[in-house]
UniProtKB/Swiss-Prot annotation:
NCBIfam families: DapE-ArgE, PRK13983.1. It comes from Methanocaldococcus jannaschii (strain ATCC 43067 / DSM 2661 / JAL-1 / JCM 10045 / NBRC 100440) (Methanococcus jannaschii). Binds 2 Zn(2+) or Co(2+) ions per subunit. This is Uncharacterized metallohydrolase MJ0457. Its cofactor is Zn(2+); Co(2+).
Length: 410
């Protein structure tokens, strides 16, 4: 089976295995991890691979679900190891009506394969497995040891994934001079290498008014109206205040986007008395997360809800509080690190493109490694359809990614 055929087989099998993160109502990664283990052992037997270890670092999560983490290492007798870290979990399919195909049944069209997880993060899993095939079919002597790591829980903070590994088994798995790639990013042409990530702040605002009948707004306080206007004014205020530009990042500005707005009312004739609004903030390293929170605190204190609402119970005041759902500082990799130099050379040799260093707003597991002093490159090739309906990836790009990894090793 050639590389394209193998890529199609692997990607198709993975798409058929639903591994939605349990935090989003899914059953988790166990079945997908079992498939990956099976494929690894098939390669071990087919190519008579020696000096390998395959270890599982599993943990039971708060839902009682087993969350798998796999570390497959081959010792080629080198001082340094190349680690490639992919994640097993996916986000849900979202609004199924927006899909042109079944999200969990692979469909191939115009050289692309469609399905949930096809890009995020099957491209990492598939290219890692293809790399093994390339190494042993070409009988090379790699200049680094190889470590393929497949983790859980990337889509919801990595408490049961890479964070768990680093907190409990760091010295067993990693050395500070190792080379690490996280294939969880990518542009269609593959020249961008992510070396930094914005700070992340997820913040939920709890907006309390007073529930009443829809025909008598003067007896309550419409939390919807307060929430709509609060979110709109805060949105504009944050973008105006924190407006610095840094061209290395994609996008080059901080972002402050309201993503969730919900109340507890299901019938049309009740005015809601409580609304939740969630903002997803991605903050350039120019600013500290504390500065953003300070601005938000002042904004809440000065927000005048009365000018936005015509009829309400004058004895009631809107209450706005918040809780931080997630807060992570920005992180960087030294652009002169060995992994960056090696990856840039490989991109040039395989893709015939000059690598460009960039930062991004999305968070990856690279952050947790960088916080501990490791140099990590986040790289891949993709159609930029992660988390979207009709997620897909070019089949040839799965092979190209493996070829770039191979170029680093040979």
């Amino acid at each position: 089976m050639d590389l394209i055929e193998e890529a199609i087989k692997l990607e198709s099998d993975l798409i058929r295995i639903n591994s939605v993160n349990p935090s989003f109502g899914g059953k988790g990664e166990k079945e997908k991890a079992e498939y990956v283990k099976k494929k690894l052992m098939e390669y071990v037997e087919s190519y008579n691979i020696e000096n390998y270890t395959l270890k599982e670092y599993n943990i039971i999560d708060k839902y009682g679900i087993e969350r798998p983490n796999i570390v497959f290492k081959i010792d080629f007798g080198r001082d340094k190891t190349l680690h490639i870290i992919s994640h097993l979990d996916t986000v849900p399919e979202g609004d199924i009506s927006l899909w042109g195909t079944n999200p969990y049944e692979p469909v191939i069209k115009d050289g692309k394969i469609y399905g949930r997880g096809s890009e995020d993060n099957h491209k990492g899993i598939v290219s890692s497995l293809l790399l093994l095939k390339m190494i042993f079919e070409n009988n090379i002597e790699p200049k680094y040891n190889l470590s393929l790591i497949f983790v859980s829980d990337e889509e919801d903070g990595s408490e049961y994934g890479l964070k768990y590994l680093l907190n409990n088994f760091e010295d067993e798995i990693f050395k500070k001079d190792d080379l690490i790639i996280v294939p969880d990013f990518g542009t269609p042409t593959g020249e961008f290498v992510e070396i930094g990530e914005k700070g992340i702040l997820w913040i939920k605002f709890n907006i309390k008014g007073k529930q009443c009948h829809g025909s008598t707004p003067e007896n309550g306080l419409n939390a919807d109206i307060v929430a709509f206007n609060f979110a709109n004014e805060l949105y504009n205020g944050l973008y105006e205040k924190f407006d610095e530009i840094n061209s290395i990042f994609l996008p080059e500005y901080s972002t402050f986007e309201p993503t969730i707005l919900k109340n507890k009312v299901e019938n049309p004739n009740t005015i809601p008395g409580y609304v939740e609004v969630v903002f997803d903030c991605r903050i350039l390293p120019t600013y500290k997360i504390e500065e953003v929170l300070e601005f938000i605190n002042k904004f809440i204190k000065n927000f005048e809800f009365k000018k936005y609402i015509k009829h309400y119970d004058n004895s009631i005041k809107a209450e706005i509080t918040y809780e931080i759902l997630k807060s992570e500082n920005p992180n960087y990799t030294d652009e002169n690190a060995e992994i960056i130099k090696e990856l840039k050379k490989a991109i040039k040799n395989v893709l015939n493109r000059d690598a460009k260093l960039c930062g991004m707003g999305g968070g990856t597991v690279a952050a947790f490694l960088r916080y501990k002093g490791y140099n990590v490159a986040v790289w891949g090739i993709g159609e930029e359809t992660a988390h979207q309906p009709n997620e897909h990836i070019k089949i040839e790009d799965l092979v190209k990614m493996a070829e770039v990894f191979y170029e680093i090793l040979k």
